[in-house]
Regions:
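Cytoplasmic membrane-interface regions of multi-pass membrane proteins
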Residues: 49-73, 102-106, 137-141, 238-242, ...
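Bilayer-spanning, highly hydrophobic alpha-helical transmembrane segments
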Residues: 4-16, 81-100, 123-133, 252-314, ...
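Short, non-transmembrane cytosolic segments of multipass membrane proteins
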Residues: 33-52, 209-236, 440-468
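Membrane-anchoring hydrophobic segments
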Residues: 1, 157-272
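Membrane-cytosol interface segments
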Residues: 1-70, 375-383, 596-604
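Hydrophobic alpha-helical transmembrane segments
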Residues: 4-5, 21-38, 107-125, 292-302, ...
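Juxtamembrane/interface alpha-helical elements of multi-pass membrane proteins
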Residues: 59-71, 112-212, 333-445, 454-457, ...
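Juxtamembrane "helix-exit" motif on the non-cytosolic side of transmembrane helices
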Residues: 17-26, 96-106, 283-288, 347-355, ...
Length: 604
């Protein structure tokens, strides 16, 4: 109640100060004081009944959260109650100002209407917003919870499968998950189940088994039900976890295979729709007398929906745990380079529309220079990702050698790594993380994706508990299987990347050849009387029309940038590392026509 009273006092003081600036000077002090006193009385009544209001809000929202399978945060009902009181007080304050204005001689009619509209809009919008928050927030939280649990479910199964080979019980395994930095959603879920266990006076495993009934995800319900039943009746869930994880890993593989199949179709549509525009511009555009600016506008209008639809398709099908998470510096430089490219496209469209000439060699040199830092950072980042791949192979080889020689696993890992500095640094970090939890947090945070974050954390946990060699062999087997699934997909997408590069180069060369051939044919045609060729033939002398050439170059650039971003998104799950592919496609797409322009400039 004290908090609500403070809110009422703050609104009253704010209204008193604002009324001194808003009200006309000829209004006496009596009327505002009376209305302020009325506002204080209204606020006091609201603050007095705020406890009852909060209790009703708590009961209503708790029921909605329970329906969504989640426990409402304790402060949630208080925040909603504060929002309700603030909305009502603000609306009443505006009504008080409206009342004073009505009794003020010569008050502007517009001010009266404005205060009335603001008061009604504030009250309606505030109550509507609070109602939506109270009704939809449990469903939104439930949706986020289901999505997060599904994203991390393969790696939860990997951890449970690895540690089911040890002496740890299912309770101990979930306690490890509770402290996990790689599986944040499941760590929060276990903490939440632990609070439920304390409230209901049951064990942690019993509280976790409740997920089989109230979790919003059907897949999570099925997995938890099978694991907890096996842990309760069989003592060890090893067999069930292995079967479930194998099924789920195969599901991931099939998802990536479907994505690869869809990408053949989607990228075929992308390259056909985007690169067909410049081809048509140089072949039938002159006959139809299409303005150069229209070519650029059509390219942009086609590229925007094609990019959004294809990007959404990839985002929905690509497993989130396999997506790379580049550092902020790489994202920043890539964003800046994209902004430079967009700026060049807009500038080109403006200059083409106004008919002003510009040098495309200088313009595209600026674009290539803007991509250079992003390319360098992307290459450095991908080299770091490759170090994690080599580290996984080192684990595989070291466990096989340790089974024969019986040597210490970490020492064998250093020997197998040899002179690979990046891998040796990862080994040193893992060894330090065994005794220093801050190093473990840093290793997980710096991992390129959830796959490697989970692998590193599982390896650290296994070293901490002194797990037998069989556990490390299981780590190598599980994560090598996951990595092989991802590697096959990325290998296929590299083939798609090279195929598209060849197609783009062919389209660029074809456009340049058609410009040269059609221009030469049109320029060489003479009428029998020696008069100038017809106007339609003059339109085909594209080589002498700089605006048409600039329009074709801009259209090719739009197609190259969009295709490069989508190919990289399908390969790694992010477009932030696409600077290299974008640069290659950009160079290939404009080389033919740009070479023709350079040849003509040198010829002059």
């Amino acid at each position: 109640v004290r908090i609500y009273t403070i809110v009422v006092v703050i609104f009253t003081l704010a209204f008193s100060l604002l009324s001194g600036f808003i009200l006309p000077r000829d209004v006496g002090p009596v009327m505002p004081l009376i209305l302020i006193a009325a506002l204080v009385v209204i606020g006091s009544v609201i603050a007095t009944f705020s406890g009852i209001l909060e209790g009703w809000m708590h009961e209503f929202m708790s029921r909605e959260f329970r329906r969504a399978g989640y426990t409402m945060p304790p402060i949630y009902s208080r925040v909603v109650t504060l929002g309700f009181i603030s909305t009502v007080m603000l609306s009443f304050s505006l009504l008080v100002l409206l009342y004073v204005t009505l009794f003020t001689p010569g008050a502007p009619t517009a001010l009266v209407r404005l205060l009335l509209a603001l008061s009604l809009i504030t009250l309606i919008a505030g109550l509507l917003t609070l109602s939506i928050v109270a009704l939809l927030s449990p469903k939104l939280i439930s949706s986020f919870r289901a999505t997060g649990a599904l994203v991390e479910l393969p790696f939860l199964l990997a951890i449970l499968r690895v540690f089911s080979k040890t002496h740890l019980t299912l309770y101990d395994m979930f306690k490890l998950v509770e402290s996990s930095q790689a599986l944040r959603w499941w760590a929060e879920e276990v903490k939440h189940r632990e609070s439920i266990a304390r409230e209901r006076g049951v064990s942690l495993l019993t509280a976790i088994s409740f997920m089989a009934e109230d979790h919003p995800s059907l897949e999570v319900r099925d997995v938890i039900k099978r694991i907890t039943l096996a842990g309760s009746y069989a003592g060890s869930p090893a067999g069930v976890v292995e079967r479930v994880s194998t099924q789920y890993f195969e599901l991931l593989r099939s998802r990536l295979e479907r994505l690869t199949g869809y990408m053949y179709i989607a990228l075929g549509i992308v390259i056909t729709s985007l690169f067909l525009i410049p081809v048509l511009a140089v072949t039938i555009g002159p006959a139809l007398r299409i303005p150069p600016s229209s070519i650029v506008l059509v390219s942009i209008a086609t590229a925007a929906p094609v990019f959004l639809v294809t990007y959404t398709l990839i985002q929905s099908m690509y497993p989130t745990g396999f997506m790379l998470n580049p550092p902020g510096a790489l994202k920043t430089f890539y964003t800046l380079s994209v902004l430079v490219i967009l700026g060049l496209i807009v500038a080109s469209l403006y200059l083409i529309y106004t008919g002003k000439p510009f040098n495309p060699l200088i313009a595209y040199s600026i674009v290539l220079a803007s991509l250079a830092p992003a390319v360098a950072l992307a290459q450095a980042y991908m080299a770091r990702v490759s170090a994690y791949e080599r580290f996984l192979r080192v684990i595989v080889d070291s466990t096989e050698l340790a089974a024969v020689t019986g040597e210490n696993l970490v020492s064998l890992m250093r020997r197998v790594a040899g002179g690979d500095r990046r891998v040796r640094k990862l080994i040193d970090d893992v060894e330090r993380a065994v005794i220093d939890d801050r190093v473990r947090v840093r290793i997980v945070r710096e991992a390129p994706n959830m796959l490697y974050a989970s692998m590193m954390e599982t390896l650290i946990y296994a070293l901490r508990i002194g797990a037998p060699l069989q556990v490390f062999s299981e780590i190598a087997t599980v994560y090598e299987h996951l990595k092989e699934t991802l590697r096959r997909h990325q290998s296929t997408m590299r083939g798609v990347e090279l195929t598209l590069a060849a197609v783009i180069a062919a389209v660029s060369l074809f456009s340049a050849v058609m410009i040269r051939v059609l221009s030469g044919i049109a320029a060489g045609i003479k009428t029998p009387t020696g008069a100038a060729a017809p106007g339609i033939l003059q339109q085909f002398i594209i080589a002498q029309d700089p605006l048409m050439i600039y329009a074709v170059l801009t259209s090719m650039m739009v197609a190259g940038v969009v295709t490069g971003a989508l190919v990289e998104k399908a390969k790694t799950g992010t477009i932030a590392t696409s600077a290299r592919v974008t640069l290659i496609y950009l160079v290939l797409s404009i080389t033919g026509v740009l070479g023709l322009v350079a040849f003509q400039l040198l010829g002059r």
